[in-house]
Regions:
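N-terminal strand-loop-strand
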Residues: 1-33
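Short, amphipathic alpha-helical segments that act as regulatory/interfacial helices
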Residues: 146-150
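Unchanged
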Residues: 37-134, 138, 151-152, 156-171
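Intrinsically disordered, low-complexity, charge-dense segments enriched in Lys/Arg
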Residues: 141-144
């Protein structure tokens, strides 16, 4: 997945978070960062660049990757490898793919810097993370990756491997 730092028309730094279409087979209606599977012969970095282009119409070269966050292993066994990229492009120029993106949100630094919630559940010894975003809660894995991005920006070395997904995402 990719957190790509862009800007608004007035120059405010933001990054896009998407909401998946309700008709999607996997995780319909959930919040997500651009990303997907690595194709044969492709590196994780190349996949991140390709998925960003396919989902949002943003063509950012691999050289614009400025960092990597911790891998997050989902309950279903997928390994999510998050990258942080710098684009600097106007987020208003996005061209979302309607097959993969129902809506795009521009996340500001003020929205990013909201304290996450950590909820105890009977099914796991690890806390479920809930990142409050506008009128919603974004859970792991997306919420965990965004949480770590916030922590890194604040100079904290916080790991996310012990942050749980909600039970509804365990499939």
């Amino acid at each position: 997945v990719v957190i790509v730092v862009m800007r608004t028309a007035d120059g405010t730094p933001v990054f896009p978070v998407t909401k998946r279409p309700s008709k999607m087979r996997a995780h319909p209606g959930q919040f997500a960062l651009p990303g997907g599977s690595v194709d044969p012969g492709e590196s994780s970095e190349q996949a991140a660049v390709r998925e960003l282009s396919e989902e949002l119409g943003v063509d950012v070269p691999e050289s614009k990757i400025i960092g990597r966050l911790d891998d997050y292993v989902t309950r279903s066994g997928f390994v999510i490898r998050p990258f942080v990229m710098w684009s600097g492009e106007d987020i208003g120029g996005l061209v979302p793919n309607p097959d993969e993106v129902a809506q795009v949100y521009a996340v500001t630094s003020e929205e990013l810097d909201v304290d996450s919630r950590f909820v105890t559940i009977a099914e796991s010894p690890n806390p479920v993370i809930q990142w409050p975003f506008r009128t919603s809660l974004i859970h792991a894995p997306t919420g965990a990756v965004i949480y770590q991005f916030r922590e890194v920006l604040n100079g904290r070395h916080t790991r996310i491997d012990k942050l749980e997904q909600p039970v509804f995402a365990w499939r």
